[in-house]
Amino acid sequence: MTEAPDVDLADGNFYASREARAAYRWMRANQPVFRDRNGLAAASTYQAVIDAERQPELFSNAGGIRPDQPALPMMIDMDDPAHLLRRKLVNAGFTRKRVKDKEASIAALCDTLIDAVCERGECDFVRDLAAPLPMAVIGDMLGVRPEQRDMFLRWSDDLVTFLSSHVSQEDFQITMDAFAAYNDFTRATIAARRADPTDDLVSVLVSSEVDGERLSDDELVMETLLILIGGDETTRHTLSGGTEQLLRNRDQWDLLQRDPSLLPGAIEEMLRWTAPVKNMCRVLTADTEFHGTALCAGEKMMLLFESANFDEAVFCEPEKFDVQRNPNSHLAFGFGTHFCLGNQLARLELSLMTERVLRRLPDLRLVADDSVLPLRPANFVSGLESMPVVFTPSPPLG
């Protein structure tokens, strides 16, 4: 690409077009803080993203993280100290011990999902393995019964549609219906946990207290919604997109099978490569010049996490999928005060499923090696919509 890309960074089709990374490459080389055809500013280099995240007093979350929508009443759209208090309250459900305690149940769930397809010799990796796993894990934490998981998956997809791109009136209504249903379900769950606490996440959040403060029912609804969306879509897309790269780079697949100790590094490379959260916005609190571009108070600047993860100044041969990449300081979980609260849980899910796929479906392969797999046209969280795979049938464990 020799000319400035003529793109709309708020249009989900840009992220599904397979042209985004070439556009990012031009931005990083020529205009680290780029303006799209509509004037939206975007930080494209690793250093620009980091520099913005290190100055939350100048680059604020409080105006909303989406380019064309106002802030929502959840901690991701807050600055400190309000954000820090809310984060401390929610963090009670994501301590290292609570995540570690879920390992056995997540491992069993991975085997159950593989059991459901292993005798067939074929499946859609997204539909049958990548999508059900995080939804089941998050669903269990939010009090969702197994028979309700498909319903929750639909709600999550519908709600992310609203946050992800230009939406039609029909899509807007679908989103509002999904939120109303989620709101009713969650308020009923909150009431039940107040009356009869269990060990699930909702019970922990209901009883969480910091400096005498507790979460109200309204706050519980919004923060569990953030957990649902963040915990479902991101892990799903990393698992599917990362596995796609292992299958397209067979030497990396074979390397992991020979040496499973490389799996932690492979998970980090899957996260870097897929960068499921494509971007977030920050609002300027003052006029400034930033990496060569004049910015005005009140405007939004997009942080292009995916572009930062492919910055040649930071990552050697960034277009090469390398499970032994070291160092690998990717920004898939963000950076700074808003670093992803669920990163330990996501890494655990990715590791447990990938280890089992490598071991139980050792000759897993794409149905068509040269196929271009469809990406979700979304400007926030995006990844593969479908990935047909085949493998040698094997008996289930259960």
UniProtKB/Swiss-Prot annotation:
SUPFAM superfamilies listed in its UniProt record: Cytochrome P450
Catalytic activity of the protein: cholest-4-en-3-one + 6 reduced [2Fe-2S]-[ferredoxin] + 3 O2 + 5 H(+) = (25R)-3-oxocholest-4-en-26-oate + 6 oxidized [2Fe-2S]-[ferredoxin] + 4 H2O; cholest-4-en-3-one + 2 reduced [2Fe-2S]-[ferredoxin] + O2 + 2 H(+) = (25R)-3-oxocholest-4-en-26-ol + 2 oxidized [2Fe-2S]-[ferredoxin] + H2O; (25R)-3-oxocholest-4-en-26-ol + 2 reduced [2Fe-2S]-[ferredoxin] + O2 + 2 H(+) = (25R)-3-oxocholest-4-en-26-al + 2 oxidized [2Fe-2S]-[ferredoxin] + 2 H2O; (25R)-3-oxocholest-4-en-26-al + 2 reduced [2Fe-2S]-[ferredoxin] + O2 + H(+) = (25R)-3-oxocholest-4-en-26-oate + 2 oxidized [2Fe-2S]-[ferredoxin] + H2O
GO CC field: peptidoglycan-based cell wall
Activity regulation: Inhibited by econazole, clotrimazole and miconazole.
EC number: 1.14.15.28
Gene3D superfamilies reported for this sequence: Cytochrome P450 (1.10.630.10)
UniProt entry keywords in alphabetical sequence: Cholesterol metabolism, Heme, Iron, Lipid degradation, Lipid metabolism, Metal-binding, Monooxygenase, NADP, Oxidoreductase, Steroid metabolism, Sterol metabolism, Virulence
List of residues binding heme: C340
Cofactors: heme
Pfam families reported for this sequence: p450
Pathway connected to this protein: Steroid metabolism; cholesterol degradation
Gene Ontology molecular function terms on file: cholest-4-en-3-one 26-monooxygenase activity; cholesterol 26-hydroxylase activity; heme binding; iron ion binding; steroid hydroxylase activity
Family the UniProt entry places it in: Belongs to the cytochrome P450 family.
Function recorded in the entry: Involved in the utilization of cholesterol as the sole carbon and energy source by degrading the side chain during infection. Primarily catalyzes the sequential oxidation of the terminal methyl of cholest-4-en-3-one into (25R)-26-hydroxycholest-4-en-3-one (alcohol), (25R)-26-oxocholest-4-en-3-one (aldehyde), to finally yield the carboxylic acid (25R)-3-oxocholest-4-en-26-oate.
Entry-linked PANTHER family: BIOTIN BIOSYNTHESIS CYTOCHROME P450, P450, PUTATIVE (EUROFUNG)-RELATED
Full protein name: Steroid C26-monooxygenase
